[in-house]
Amino acid sequence: MSLSTEVKAKILADFGRCENDTGSTEVQVALLTAQINHLQAHFKEHIHDHHSRRGLLRMVSSRRKLTAYLKRTDVARYTALIQKLGLRR
């Protein structure tokens, strides 16, 4: 259930600060959001896949922690990221 390299490269280009930026908070949140959206589509078809659902909940928790960190450290970057990804908060 991973993302293709093309999708990852597009996310890195859109949210990265420089060309090789893979670890900034914005990139991590954007990658997690793409994986979460991919898994949500998977669960519409495979309702009883509880093993993957546990992984989804871990990703949501990780994204929540990263967005809380970003909100605590830099509110402007946080609001820009939330608007760009279309997340609630």
UniProtKB/Swiss-Prot annotation:
<dbReference type="Pfam" id="PF00312">
    <property type="entry name" value="Ribosomal_S15"/>
</dbReference>
<keyword id="KW-0699">rRNA-binding</keyword>
<keyword id="KW-0689">Ribosomal protein</keyword>
<dbReference type="GO" id="GO:0003735">
    <property type="term" value="F:structural constituent of ribosome"/>
</dbReference>
<dbReference type="GO" id="GO:0006412">
    <property type="term" value="P:translation"/>
</dbReference>
<dbReference type="InterPro" id="IPR005290">
    <property type="entry name" value="Ribosomal_uS15_bac-type"/>
</dbReference>
<dbReference type="GO" id="GO:0019843">
    <property type="term" value="F:rRNA binding"/>
</dbReference>
<comment type="subunit">
    <text>Part of the 30S ribosomal subunit. Forms a bridge to the 50S subunit in the 70S ribosome, contacting the 23S rRNA.</text>
</comment>
<dbReference type="InterPro" id="IPR000589">
    <property type="entry name" value="Ribosomal_uS15"/>
</dbReference>
<keyword id="KW-0687">Ribonucleoprotein</keyword>
<keyword id="KW-0694">RNA-binding</keyword>
<comment type="function">
    <text>Forms an intersubunit bridge (bridge B4) with the 23S rRNA of the 50S subunit in the ribosome.</text>
</comment>
<comment type="similarity">
    <text>Belongs to the universal ribosomal protein uS15 family.</text>
</comment>
<dbReference type="GO" id="GO:0022627">
    <property type="term" value="C:cytosolic small ribosomal subunit"/>
</dbReference>
<comment type="function">
    <text>One of the primary rRNA binding proteins, it binds directly to 16S rRNA where it helps nucleate assembly of the platform of the 30S subunit by binding and bridging several RNA helices of the 16S rRNA.</text>
</comment>
<protein>
    <recommendedName>
        <fullName>Small ribosomal subunit protein uS15</fullName>
    </recommendedName>
</protein>
<dbReference type="InterPro" id="IPR009068">
    <property type="entry name" value="uS15_NS1_RNA-bd_sf"/>
</dbReference>
